[in-house]
Amino acid sequence: MSSPESPKGPAPFPRGMALLVAGAFFMEIVDATIITPAIPLIASSFGVDPVDVNLAISAYLVTLAVLIPASGWVADRFGARPVFAAAIAIFTLASIGCALSVSLPMLVGMRILQGVGGAMMVPVGRLAVLRVSGKANLVRTIALLTWPALAAPVLAPVLGGAIATLGSWRWIFFVNIPIGVFGFLLSLKLIRGERDPVPRPLDWRGLLVLGAGIAAALMALESIRVAGTDWLLVAAGGATALVLLAVAAWHLLHTRHPLIELRVLRVPTLRITVTAGSLYRLVITAVPFLLPLQFQLVFGWTPFLSGLLVAVLFAGNIAIKPATTPLMRHFGIRRVLIVNGVLSVGCYGLLASLGPTMPVAVIGVVLFLSGVLRSVGFTAYVTLAFSDVGGDRLTHANTLNAAVQELASGLGIAVAALLLSTLTPLAATPHTAYAWTFLVLGALMALTVVESFRLPRDAATAVTAR
């Protein structure tokens, strides 16, 4: 494939194509976020514990992580346009299935099917845009593609909370239908990307072993929460996950055409994105899952009010977004990540202090601040991931980063559920259990600061310099 940079100058910015992919990203995130204010109602409808509904979120995200690595091969084999269009169709149909679910297992199954569509939708579209953008447009493209990750969560909790309060939670999944139909039609016109006449073979063995290892890891986390003191079962599940993941890593490093090219981790900026960035993603994903549960089950608030306050958190994301690129250009990504991480640790201390007697306005300020910090870190890590890779390595870096970040999000939900279930019996009150959970998450956030110090001082200057 030819270089994205033309000999005559930088490649033109593919605005229409980028907006369509951003719209698909928006649809995917809305569906993941809109469910959170309705978790207690979904649990009541199915007769399960609210924390159990974490499976409906984590199963979707883990499916993305397992299948995203194959998305590059599928796009090369069949072409970006038909794959992207088919993915939108699958995602939209699965949304209807979620709305018609009659049990938690059925809902989880439909969410897994959504993950199949999502795994082919956003990564394929994002890679198609990156391939035609060129390095001169990288920061601009990344900024546009990350807007949905910041804007969709603002609308989704309010919409989800309003629907859950005024009607049935089942209607929250139908919002994807008009977006999906419109996106499907536009994709047939706007998406570019030729199919590879001789695509590399798909690493089926790597896909199966890695998928089994990730699934085993999620099941091991769930077994800790459910099995309680049955440590033999927990140990067996954990050992199985470790063995499968070790075998997968060995295979990926020694096969000719690996599902995921781990050797791109030799690029320091990408390696730190995978380590610190994944932990950062894990921690920030846990918060929107915990807050609606705390607001409804402990504070006694309605789904609408809890959704409104979660939206305030994501409003902070948007408010700071225009300043994220200037911040990175002025101070450098390394300094931004370190300072942002330290402030985030303090913010988790504030989240731990939230209580039902605290004025709603004060809670809103804390959540807004949390959203501001979340946005800065999120954008910095996404930019860092692609700052020093290009050419053929861009495909490998995109696949690896997308899979790892989705896995981190899925594990973030599972870890939050595990912490809450573990700490609740030990805490004097339910409110204390949530406070301890936020403090543990703050400690994990502190580890990202330590890792950020390993970045070179001039990290990512190639794409952040004026």
Residue ranges of predicted features:
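Intrinsic disorder in cytosolic terminal tails and internal cytosolic loops
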Residues: M1-F13, D196, F453-R466
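A gly/Pro-rich, aromatic-decorated transmembrane alpha-helix motif that marks the paired
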Residues: W147, A151-G167, A215, M219, ...
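Hydrophobic transmembrane-helix bundles of small-molecule transporters
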Residues: T165-A276, L441-G442
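Membrane-water interface at transmembrane helix exits
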Residues: D76, I191-R192, L218-V226, A249-L253, ...
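12-transmembrane solute porter fold
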Residues: P14-I39, F46, P50-A59, A70-G72, ...
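Helix-loop-helix hairpins in multi-pass membrane proteins, especially solute transporters
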Residues: I68-R205
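N-terminal membrane topogenic signal
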Residues: G9-M17, D203-R205
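Transmembrane helix-loop junctions and nearby membrane-interface residues
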Residues: A99-M106, L188-I191, L221-A227, A249-L252, ...
